[in-house]
Amino acid sequence: MHVLVADRLTCSRCGPEFGLILRADQTHDRRVTEGVLGCPNCRDQYPITDGFGDLRAPPRSELPKGLAGDPVIRTQDESEYLLPLLGITRGPATVLLIGGPTVLGPGLAALLDDIHVVGVDADLARWPTDPSWSRIVSHPGIPFFSRSLRGVVIDGRLDRHWFEEAARVIAPMSRVVVVNAVTTTSEWLQAAGLSIMANESGRVVATSS
């Protein structure tokens, strides 16, 4: 986990108004491989193990099955289509991938300088440590400050709450991209305050004002 990503994380128990304090036990090139993220409000601690951050609010049980699956190697070309959908041409930028799209994380991170890619999915705990991006799991929402991210790519198979959270965390004039979109996707995004830019071939692009 990159230290600049850790600075943007918030407490899943207390809510997005409460930032976390990083205790880095083991780092390399500004990446935390072992450590703890602590909340000064509720005193809860979120572990970072092998670079993977568990940002689930307590009580924490065994990790559930995610949507990313086993580790795979994807090329930059397979991730390239995301950049025009996100409307990002240069950094600095922090982009969040949730669910199935997290498999494109390393490829996306390699496309631009000064971009921080964060994947959110329980299956990423089994993925090897990769300095090009950050891996976390979270519950019940997205553990980032409101209006702080340049873009979110989200799996359309997820519950409505995740779409509301995606709308909350993107910065003004930024976009949410949905892959594996379903019939209710556009309705959910609009109800969350976003405007639909495109809806085609199982992908929906929405923007904040």
Where are these regions (language model features)?
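N-terminal auxiliary segments of SAM/dcSAM-dependent transferases
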Residues: M1-K65
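Conserved alpha-helix/loop element of class I SAM-dependent methyltransferases that forms part
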Residues: I21, R56, G66-T94, P101-G107, ...
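A generic alpha-to-beta junction signature in SAM-dependent methyltransferases
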Residues: T89, L112, R168-P172
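A short acidic, Gly/Pro-enriched loop at the edge of an enzyme's catalytic core
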Residues: P92, D130-G156, R160-E164
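Glycine-centered, small-residue-biased loops immediately flanking beta-strands
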Residues: A93, I115, S174
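Short, polar loop motifs at secondary-structure junctions
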Residues: G100-L104, V118-W127, A181-T184
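A short glycine-rich, Lys/Arg-flanked "PGG" loop and its adjoining helix->strand segment in the class I
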Residues: R160-V177, A181-V182, S186
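Core SAM-dependent methyltransferase catalytic element
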Residues: E187-S209
